[in-house]
Amino acid sequence: MAQRDYYDVLGVDKNASESDINKAYRKLAKKYHPDLNHEPGAEEKYKEVNEAYEVLHDKQKKAQYDQFGQAGVNGQAGFGGQGYGGFGGQGGYSSQGFGDFGDIFGDIFGSAFGGGRSRVDPTAPQKGQDLDYTMTIDFMDAIKGKKTDITYTRSEVCPTCDGSGAEKGTHPITCDKCHGTGVMTVTRQTPLGVIQQQTTCDKCGGRGTIIKHPCQTCHGKGTIDKKQTLEVKVPAGIDNGQQIRLSGQGEAGKNGGPYGDLYIVFRVKPSKEFRRNGTTIYSEAPISFAQAALGDKIRVNTVHGPVDLTIPAGTQPNTNFKLRGQGVPKINGTGNGDQEVTVKVVIPKKINDKQKEALVDYVKAGGGNISPQEKNFFERLKDKLNGE
């Protein structure tokens, strides 16, 4: 039976980079691996993929294949029907020379191939777990900052056994099953042959040691749960969803390792008066028709206190004014953001006779015609006042 083109087998072109060839191989090797794919023909496709990869990932073999085709690599591919022998070089699937071959099988079988991924020494010092704490604060506290106390529960080193987990005067002993490594080797029979896989020791639970006489305070854990009260400084300018890290305020470490960290996530309550986007504050200020037309100086609230705002004559409704430096403190810099004030021209729902008279005089003076109408503003105003 004619052999397929190796480039077609991997689904790459002749100009494919080494990285593209590796990616294609990893994908197909996982897809057709006999332990994962039990469909008819998967085993043959798996052999074909490996044969193509062994040639194309090797620069010398690839050059010979590109020049002479199959004749240039016959007898070199190493997959001449030897089956699924062992992985020590006796069978056709030796992991030697296959860049990320061991990684692929490591994904499938854990640490079975070439020792797998490195394991942490179970007796070495290990940093404790980090903790999260959500703090809800008022809008103005986020702007100005504050100090406040929080109480939470964390694990701490047992004061009785100093974290060993053993009763005072005794010590943990080395596990006789894993010899202190925390892992044991399990042998599996697969279509690829006998595979040795490392897994957590079922006697010591991966600790590498056994406690024969547990501490009565922590019951062998080496840690106790304890409530902790801390003073937290809320930074001025903190925003909703942002967090700060308090080093060493998390869970206790193992084997004398350092404590983890505490991350405080802030939830900021909304304000009825202000709206915030980053370091910019938004607010509204009501003004009368006369103030908009004639201009005025008004007092507006900012997050830092009231300030004067000059309204120029002829100000239109919904005009925005910027108050520089009246926004949120910049948490990672200096100075403040700005505040943008939108003026809202308030039209009175009811007016007295004198106000009506004044408006009529205003219209008579030519202040009413804004756009052509069948009736001018004065006529319509008269109709309105006369109830027509």
UniProtKB/Swiss-Prot annotation:
The highest taxon in the source lineage is Bacteria
Which residues are listed for Zn(2+) 2 binding in this entry? 175, 178, 201, 204
Q: Which PROSITE patterns match?
A: DNAJ_1 (PS00636), DNAJ_2 (PS50076), ZF_CR (PS51188)
Q: Name the cofactor(s) required for activity, per the record.
A: Zn(2+)
CDD domains associated with the record? DnaJ, DnaJ_C, DnaJ_zf
Name this polypeptide is given: Chaperone protein DnaJ
Q: Which GO terms describe its cellular component?
A: cytoplasm
Record-annotated J domain positions: 5-69
Q: Which GO terms describe its biological process?
A: chaperone cofactor-dependent protein refolding; DNA replication; protein refolding; response to heat
Report quaternary structure and partners.
Homodimer.
GO MF, any single term: zinc ion binding
Which Pfam families does the entry link to? DnaJ (PF00226), DnaJ_C (PF01556), DnaJ_CXXCXGXG (PF00684)
